[in-house]
């Protein structure tokens, strides 16, 4: 017999596991464990469990195990949600997107191991996995009926905020890509101090340019989210969904900037680097929820 509470717990479990997939991928890259299993996939050094287990192999194996578990749990969630609450318009598309992008993410990860892709291709891996995470995250919010609790199901988002949010989505995604590129191009400590090198602000190497591009995009992202936040709070002060949602997004980008700066200042402290990945993961999940709300508004306009 179907129990809504069980579906809630399943959605929370899937969201947490997907967050660990994101953090695990960041951990693999930050610790240089990409080749921990050699060029074997799905096996590790040609075996299910190799006899020799150095730390890079353990990290890579753990990431693969969590990724495999995420596929099982997300598939379980997608099927259950489809069957029992598929009447909610967004549930079926979100279920399809979560599974599809999880599979694409796995294929890119496998290709990276087997064929050793370049940094610019590898950087797509994190962004694609974020889309899958965001789908699961939004699905969880729907299951918990956040819409009804905060009157989001009756919300009308006017065009100015929609434009600001669409542009914010593109800017944030580009920033995520450049951030992933920083990791894969081994450019975390390139381009000197933060926010700019004191001795020479002109980038010289490819790593310098990658780091420079990421900092530039981060700067644009921070100010654009701040502008969007101010507009949202000023014009939708009566609506808790907008007020709480965009305030959370602004807090997350502040934390993202702080951890980004601390990563440079601490020579990429692993804990800070993982927090950096976690904050952007949650932020993108919030943006995905904003997109769902905007699409509802657009559909309501077409009906009228």
From Swiss-Prot:
Cofactor: heme b
Top-level lineage group: Bacteria
A Pfam entry, by short name: COX15-CtaA
Disulfide pairings: 37-44
Chain ranges on the Cytoplasmic side, renumbered to this chain: 1-8, 89-93, 145-163, 237-244, 292-304
Location of the active site: 60
Keyword ATP-binding: no
Positions bound to heme b: 214, 276
EC number: 1.17.99.9
InterPro entries hit by this protein: COX15/CtaA_fam, COX15/CtaA_HemeA_synthase, HemeA_Synthase_type1
Metabolic or biological pathway: Porphyrin-containing compound metabolism; heme A biosynthesis; heme A from heme O: step 1/1
Quaternary structure and interacting proteins, as annotated: Interacts with CtaB.
Domain notes: The N-half (TM1-TM4) and C-half (TM5-TM8) domains are connected by an intracellular loop. Each domain is formed from four-helix bundles and they align in a pseudo twofold symmetry manner. The N-half domain is the substrate-heme O binding domain and the C-half domain is the cofactor heme B binding domain.
Function: Catalyzes the conversion of heme O to heme A by two successive hydroxylations of the methyl group at C8. The first hydroxylation forms heme I, the second hydroxylation results in an unstable dihydroxymethyl group, which spontaneously dehydrates, resulting in the formyl group of heme A.
Name of the protein: Heme A synthase
Taxonomic source organism: Staphylococcus haemolyticus (strain JCSC1435)
Lineage, highest ranks first: Bacteria, Bacillati, Bacillota, Bacilli, Bacillales
């Amino acid at each position: 017999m179907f129990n809504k509470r069980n579906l809630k717990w399943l959605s929370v479990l899937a969201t947490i596991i997907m967050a660990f997939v994101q953090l695990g991928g960041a951990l693999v890259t930050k610790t240089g464990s990409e080749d921990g299993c050699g060029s074997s996939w799905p096996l590790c050094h040609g075996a299910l469990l190799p006899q020799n287990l150095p730390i890079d192999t353990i990290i890579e194996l753990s990431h693969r195990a969590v990724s495999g578990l995420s596929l099982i749990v997300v598939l379980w969630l997608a099927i259950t949600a489809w069957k029992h609450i598929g009447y909610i318009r967004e549930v079926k598309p979100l279920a399809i997107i979560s599974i599809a992008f999880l599979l694409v993410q796995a294929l890119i990860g496998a290709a990276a191991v087997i064929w050793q892709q370049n940094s610019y291709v590898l950087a797509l891996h994190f962004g694609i996995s974020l889309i899958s995470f965001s789908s699961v995250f939004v699905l969880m919010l729907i299951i918990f009926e956040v819409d009804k609790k905060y009157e989001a199901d009756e919300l009308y988002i006017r065009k100015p905020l929609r434009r600001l949010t669409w542009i914010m989505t593109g800017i944030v995604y580009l920033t995520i890509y450049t951030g992933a590129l920083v990791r894969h191009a081994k450019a975390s400590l390139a381009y000197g101090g933060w926010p700019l090198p004191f001795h020479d602000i002109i980038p010289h190497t490819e790593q310098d340019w990658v780091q420079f591009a990421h900092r530039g995009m981060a700067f644009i992202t921070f100010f654009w989210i701040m502008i969007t936040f101010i507009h949202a709070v000023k014009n939708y002060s009566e609506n808790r969904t907008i007020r709480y949602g965009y305030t959370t997004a602004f807090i997350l980008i502040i934390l993202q900037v702080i951890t980004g700066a601390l990563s440079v200042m601490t020579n990429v402290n692993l804990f800070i680097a993982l927090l950096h990945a976690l904050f952007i993961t949650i932020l993108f999940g919030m943006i995905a929820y904003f997109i769902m709300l905007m699409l509802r508004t657009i559909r309501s306009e077409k009906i009228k």
